[in-house]
Each structure stands twice: as structure tokens, then as C-alpha cells.
Amino acid sequence: MNSWWTYVNRWIFSTNAKDIAILYLLFGLVSGIIGSVFSFIIRMELSAPGSQFLSGNGQLYNVAISAHGILMIFFFIIPALFGAFGNYLVPLMIGAPDVAYPRVNNFTFWLLPPALMLLLISALTEEGPGGGWTVYPPLSSITSHSGPAIDLAILSLQLTGISSTLGSVNLIATMINMRAPGLSLYQMPLFAWAIMITSILLLLTLPVLAGGLFMLFSDRNLNTSFYAPEGGGDPVLYQHLFWFFGHPEVYILIMPAFGVVSHIIPSLAHKPIFGKEGMLWAMLSIALLGLMVWSHHLFTVGLDVDTRAYFSAATMVIAIPTGIKIFSWLATLTGGAIQWSRVPMLYAIGFLILFTIGGLTGVILSNSVLDIAFHDTYFVVAHFHYVLSMGALFGLCGAYYWSPKMFGLMYNETLASIQFWILFIGVNIVFGPQHFLGLNGMPRRIPDYPEAFVGWNFVSSIGSVISILSLFLFMYVMYDQFTSNRVVKTNPYLIPSYFDDNVIFVNEKLGVAQSIEWLLHSPVHEHAFNTLPTKSI
């Protein structure tokens, strides 16, 4: 009984940022698996023209799409990249004993499982929410979705919003007030900065989403007409409010991945990151510009031509700081003693390639004239999946990089690299052909299509099967890591270096590192620092 209570005390009532981070990671993986199941349903339905599995039920197809989008964004990438890595690594990197508000941190996590339950109940209620992850009225209004499904989905999103807001306040307070003596904000590692910028974006945009969703809720239940034209409202208002959150949201999703890659590449190329200040200002610029471009999602609603010109230009400008980041990573790789075959390095290189492709299609879509043709086609789907399903997801596989530090156990590098190649090939086969479908005008969110599109759709669905196989292999790699007892006590990525004058931190027992967390014991003790670390130079 006592051991059971210890277990509950550690995992349910936890105030330790590292334990909460592991809960976040586990929660994110479970949600990601459920989201992958929904995506598999979508791809199987589209594997051939006509009705395949959903017996012609278009509403059910749209429910699968809504569930897939919301699960992957709010319940997979944010908890896993922002929640898990943010909580685990930020306090270690800045030399803090924990986050600023440990109990709020616990509450922040435990808001998510009820939110997930609400979303899944919503999908199973009456006809389910068929509005996509964007939940646009009038499709999401009481006239089109009369049951409680959309209300439950709105409530679920509000809970995740509260969770992210509290988590952001917590991490910002931690970074401002709890840095090790002598460590200035400017000297923080890039990952900590990425989390800081992500938190600021969340705090600025989530209240707008909350307001927009609450007005939708009151339109549905309290007889207001914010978005109902018959009462003097305007559905386009919702689109503005939603995308003012929704566009910074995509930078919120990718920013921690930027931070992860900025640690993996220097560590495995044995060089300091190229242009750390430039990288930092690039991230800040991306965040600032990201708040100023939301209407590029609305080019088709009849905006003024000057407005379209501004939003096109502003969107293209984001390519500049993004390019700075890509070229700085490439410059870091140049001339380094690179460990090409290490799994985190494979993911970092994959990230660079695929994120660049996603960025290029983004520049195409930023042209308002072209976007009017491409809007709501599979070209857009291919674009943002290259950025998210390959950018954020490959960044998330930085879990491979830090997992020996988190668990003190090494993964099987051979299996993990096989898993990388299967995933890399799989996602490209899924989303590459979707560019061609979009160029030919195949619309999004439609469960059927003319036979002319069958070729590339079939290829795409084959890719989906390959990706799901890589997911199963990933689960086995995790199982193997926890059961095969390959204990790691030091930094597993260190190799003997004969010309190493770039050492930043040294610990006699554990070797050298570019950021402080690698100098700690693996797995990190509950109290990582016996005394506060002090920066001497």
C-alpha cells in the first residue's frame, strides 16, 4: 500500500518538472497514436475513388479530419515539444532547481487528459464535430451542427488553451527569475530561447482564440449573432480571430523544433552553433512577423487588393529569417567532425531538407493570386504537412537525442536509424504526391474524387501504410530501450576529439558539453543541482 501511495505521490501529485515532463511526453505519444489512427482512416478512405470504408458518410469523414487535426496540434505536438522538452530541459539549461510555480505546473498537465476526453466524447456524440480543426461558422453554427458535439470540442479547446497559457506564464517566469547567477538572458541556450519565444506567442494569441471560440459558443447556445449575418454578424470575423491565433500557432509548433535542431547539430558536428545571436534574432523576427500575417489564410474571402498586397509581402518576408536559420545550421555543419550516422543527426538533416521544401511551397502560397487557385486544395495540405508532419515531428525526434539523459538508458541505434529511414520514405510518399493532386485542383476535406486522381492518391495511401509501420517500429524501439538495460551514465554522443578548443562546460566525471544538462547525472536526479550552478565567465 505504501509503495502504491509513493507511486501516486510521484506521478499524480507531482511537482517535479522532470516527472511532469515525462507525463507530457507519454500523453503526447498516446494522443499522437490516436491522431495517426484518424489520419490512417482518412488515407484509406481516399485510397480509391468512391466509398471505401465510411460507407458514403461524408460527415464521419469530416469528423475524422477534425479529430486528426485537433489531436495532432493541441494534444500531440504542443504537449510533447513544448510541454515535455520545455519542462524537462529549460530548468536544467538555465541552472534552476525547478520551474517557478511547480504546483501550477502539475495543474497545467492535468488539464489535458480531461480535454482529450472531451474531444473524444465529442467525436462520439451524435454526428460528431465535422467542422475541421478550424471550426468555421456557419458550418459550426447551431443551424448546421445542432447537437452538443461542437460545444464539447470548443470546451476541449478552451481547456488546452488554459493549460498552454499557464504553462507559458510558468516557463517565462522561470527564465526571467531563476537563471543561474551570472547567466544573462542573452547567454541562455537557443532551446531555452525557443521556449521563451513560443511562450510569448502563446500568451499573445490564445486569449484571441478563447474570445473567438466563446463567441461561437454563445452564438450556438445564448442566441447571440456575432457570426450570424441575419443578426448583423459576420462569419469572416471568426476567421480573423481564429487565424490571428492560428498562424502564430504554426510558429509555436515549429519553434521548439528549431531549438532542438540548434542543439543536436552543434553537438554532433563538434562545433559551436554558427551565429548564435543571428539565430536568436531570426527566431524573434519570425515570432514578430508571425503575428502580422494572419490574413493570408483569408485571400479568398474578398479582401481589398491593398490588404492582399500587404499580407502577401509580409508573408514572404518571413522567408528571410527562416533562411538565415537554415543557412546558419548548414554553416554549423560545414567543416565539422560530423557523426552522420547518429540517429539525432539523421533527424536533424531530415528536418533541414523537408522543412526547406515546406518553406518553398509556403512562399508559392504566399502570393495572393496563386493562393486563390490553390486555396483548399491538396497543395495546401502538402505544404503544411511538410512543415508540421516533417518539421515539427522530426524536431520531436530530438527525443532520441535527450532520451539517454532523461532515462539513463540507451536506445538501439540500428533499429532507431531503420525507423528513421522508414519514416523519412513514408512521409515523403504520403505528402509528395499531394502537391501534384493540388496542382490539378483536388479539393481538401472531400471524401470522394474523380477517377483522374486515383494514381497519386493510391501512392499517397501506400505512404501512409509505410508511416504507420514506422510508428510501430518506434514503439518497439521505445520498449527495447526500457527493457534491454543498456545503462548510460555519461554523454553517449562524445567521441575522442584531438582538436577540441570549443569546450564550453567541463565536468571531470562526465566529460564536456555545449550546454549544462549533459554535465548532470543520467538519469537526472530529482534535485538536479545540490547547490546552484554559477557562471564564472
Curated annotation (Swiss-Prot):
Ca(2+) binds at residues 45, 48, 50, 447. It catalyses: 4 Fe(II)-[cytochrome c] + O2 + 8 H(+)(in) = 4 Fe(III)-[cytochrome c] + 2 H2O + 4 H(+)(out). Component of the cytochrome c oxidase (complex IV, CIV), a multisubunit enzyme composed of a catalytic core of 3 subunits and several supernumerary subunits. The complex exists as a monomer or a dimer and forms supercomplexes (SCs) in the inner mitochondrial membrane with ubiquinol-cytochrome c oxidoreductase (cytochrome b-c1 complex, complex III, CIII). It is an enzyme of class 7 (translocase). Belongs to the heme-copper respiratory oxidase family. SUPFAM superfamilies: Cytochrome c oxidase subunit I-like. Its EC number is 7.1.1.9. The chain crosses the membrane at residues 22-42, 70-90, 104-124, 152-172, 190-210, 241-261, 279-299, 318-338, 345-365, 379-399, 418-438, 458-478. O2 binds at residue 251. It comes from the Eukaryota. It is a multi-pass membrane protein. One of its GO terms (cellular component) is respiratory chain complex IV. GO terms for molecular function: copper ion binding; cytochrome-c oxidase activity; heme binding. Its main location: mitochondrion. Heme a3 binds at residue 383. This is Cytochrome c oxidase subunit 1. Component of the cytochrome c oxidase, the last enzyme in the mitochondrial electron transport chain which drives oxidative phosphorylation. The respiratory chain contains 3 multisubunit complexes succinate dehydrogenase (complex II, CII), ubiquinol-cytochrome c oxidoreductase (cytochrome b-c1 complex, complex III, CIII) and cytochrome c oxidase (complex IV, CIV), that cooperate to transfer electrons derived from NADH and succinate to molecular oxygen, creating an electrochemical gradient over the inner membrane that drives transmembrane transport and the ATP synthase. There is a cross-link at residues 247-251 (1'-histidyl-3'-tyrosine (His-Tyr)). Fe(II)-heme a binds at residues 68, 385. Cu cation binds at residues 247, 296-297. Binds 2 heme A groups non-covalently per subunit. Binds a copper B center. It is found in: Mitochondrion inner membrane. Pathway: Energy metabolism; oxidative phosphorylation. GO terms for biological process: aerobic respiration; mitochondrial electron transport, cytochrome c to oxygen; respiratory electron transport chain. Its cofactor is heme; Cu cation.
